[in-house]
């Protein structure tokens, strides 16, 4: 969800850490955590770093510092490019298996993911996987909040596709409006994926008469509120 890509990056963090044991969490507890950018989608990575705290947490942002994990030790008030341009020449290489171990776990998870996808029955996750895997290159994917973005972050998305989602609104506010506005602003072919509850909540967005002709909506009509079937206590809702 960062729209930053590299072969060594982990794009689907929940698939990596969900099966972790206590020993795995302790093994991958970081000494230094460096963050930049906006809100973190994954609840699991937040829970991991809040419990297995790094010794140092540096956040890089010209304006604000998010203490998402309750561990912030320093705020560098510069652009990330400026920070890394100055910091990288000062860094010293050390012997560590952290990266290779993580790469191995990533490989194993990918094998299991591919096997599961090939065997799974028709379900919400299959729909998201099929649609996202067939999006046109260099397009923009706008995703509704709640379960939609959580499914999407389990899927490998083509690096040429920009991904956006409303976060920090504690719900489904304005996802369709945001998607239409983004489609108008950047001119890229835009696909909006969301559930029926989120779609109808913001259906007034479709009253606008300037919606681009290539703007597409994929509506997952799964009976409403898929997130409530995922969260604890869903039996009582």
Model-derived features with residue positions:
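Short glycine-rich anion-binding loops that position phosphate/pyrophosphate groups of nucleotides
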Residues: 37-41, 63, 146-148, 197, ...
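Active-site diphosphate/adenylate-binding microenvironment
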Residues: 104-188
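Thiamine diphosphate
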Residues: 154-237
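Glycine-rich, charge-decorated loop segments at or immediately adjacent to ligand/cofactor-binding or catalytic sites
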Residues: 5-13, 66-75, 226-235
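Short, polar loop motifs at secondary-structure junctions
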Residues: 2-5, 60-66, 147-148
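Glycine-rich, anion-gripping cofactor-binding loops and their flanking helix/strand elements
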Residues: 1-56, 158-186, 200-204
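Terminal amphipathic helices with adjacent charged low-complexity linkers/tails
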Residues: 52, 57-101
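Short internal beta-strands
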Residues: 1-2, 57-62, 216-221
């Amino acid at each position: 969800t960062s729209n930053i890509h590299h072969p060594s990056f982990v794009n689907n963090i929940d698939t990596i850490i969900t099966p972790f044991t206590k020993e795995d969490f302790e093994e991958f507890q970081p000494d230094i955590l460096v963050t930049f950018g906006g809100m973190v989608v994954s609840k699991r990575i937040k829970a991991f770093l809040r419990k297995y705290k790094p010794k140092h947490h540096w956040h890089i942002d010209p304006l604000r510092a998010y203490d998402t994990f309750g561990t912030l030790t320093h705020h560098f008030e510069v652009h990330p490019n400026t920070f890394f341009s100055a910091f990288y020449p000062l860094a010293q290489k050390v012997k560590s298996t952290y990266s290779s171990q993580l790469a191995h776990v990533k490989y194993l998870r990918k094998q299991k993911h591919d096997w599961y996808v090939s065997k799974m029955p028709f379900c919400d996750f299959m729909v998201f996987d099929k649609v996202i895997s067939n999006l046109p290159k260099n397009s923009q994917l706008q995703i509704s909040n709640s379960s939609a973005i959580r499914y999407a972050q389990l899927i490998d998305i083509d690096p040429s596709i920009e991904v956006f989602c409303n976060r920090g609104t504690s719900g489904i506010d304005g996802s369709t409006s945001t998607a239409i506005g983004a489609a108008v602003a950047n001119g890229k072919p835009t696909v909006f994926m969301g559930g029926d509850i989120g779609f109808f909540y913001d259906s007034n967005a479709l009253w606008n008469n300037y919606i681009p002709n290539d703007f597409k909506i994929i509506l997952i009509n799964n009976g409403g509120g898929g997130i409530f079937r995922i969260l604890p206590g869903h039996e009582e809702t």
